[in-house]
């Protein structure tokens, strides 16, 4: 909890103290919601541990803390969605596939699982239903991200295939000479030679 508050404070300070450009809003900001969701899931598992004496003593406190973290997670969704709209709609930054988009998928899925488990553990049917719905949202986002990744992969392979064909068709006077990468041992020896004695 302390680490979460410390990192959250640093992120908020960065957002408030420095000018924010659209390119600065990257998908990893969604990880903040994922951290709350993991906390909710862990709390739900502790509440469900009926046989452990320590779990029996702390189950009320853990259940209450889990509900607080669960309530904080959805509070983060509107600002994150608004930031994405500000970046891609208002400032017209194209939405292209990048590997960091997967950091949106995980928090949504974890939030769905955490809410579902908390609903079961604390006997809160509304929270359980929200978890089920969020699971479907996470599956949809996963599918969109996966299809975008496949499209990006196909486009990248297509580009590299066209460029290698163009290189093969070039005449010999303009041939590109490729040198194999240096071995690790060679790099270590070069590093040691450049070190002062």
Curated annotation (Swiss-Prot):
GO terms for biological process: transmembrane transport. It comes from the Bacteria. Induction: A member of the dormancy regulon. Induced in response to reduced oxygen tension (hypoxia), low levels of nitric oxide (NO) and carbon monoxide (CO). It is hoped that this regulon will give insight into the latent, or dormant phase of infection. The chain crosses the membrane at residues 30-50, 61-81, 101-121, 130-150. This protein serves as an immunogenic antigen, inducing gamma-interferon responses in whole-blood cultures from M.tuberculosis-exposed adults in Uganda, The Gambia and South Africa, indicating this might be a good vaccine candidate. It is found in: Cell membrane. It holds the Pfam family SLAC1. Keywords: Cell membrane, Membrane, Transmembrane, Transmembrane helix. One of its GO terms (cellular component) is plasma membrane. It is a multi-pass membrane protein. InterPro entries: SLAC1/Mae1/Ssu1/TehA (IPR004695), Voltage-dep_anion_channel_sf (IPR038665). This is Uncharacterized membrane protein Rv1735c. It comes from Mycobacterium tuberculosis (strain ATCC 25618 / H37Rv).
């Amino acid at each position: 909890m302390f680490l979460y508050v410390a990192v959250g404070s640093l992120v908020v300070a960065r957002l408030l103290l420095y000018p924010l450009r659209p390119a600065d809003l990257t998908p990893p900001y969604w990880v903040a919601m994922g951290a709350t969701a993991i906390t909710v899931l862990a709390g739900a598992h502790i509440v469900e541990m009926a046989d452990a004496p320590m779990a029996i003593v702390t189950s009320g406190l853990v259940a209450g803390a889990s509900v607080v973290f669960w309530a904080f997670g959805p509070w983060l969704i509107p600002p994150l969605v608004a930031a994405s709209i500000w970046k891609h709609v208002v400032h017209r930054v194209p939405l292209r596939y990048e590997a960091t988009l997967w950091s949106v998928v995980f928090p949504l899925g974890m939030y769905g699982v955490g809410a579902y488990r908390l609903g079961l553990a604390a006997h809160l049917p509304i929270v359980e239903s929200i978890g089920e719905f969020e699971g479907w949202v996470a599956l949809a986002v996963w599918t969109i991200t996966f299809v975008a990744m496949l499209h990006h992969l196909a486009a990248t392979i297509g580009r590299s295939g066209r460029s290698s064909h163009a290189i093969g068709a070039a005449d010999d006077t303009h041939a590109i000479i490729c040198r194999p990468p240096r071995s690790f041992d060679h790099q270590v020896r070069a590093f040691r030679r450049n070190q002062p004695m």
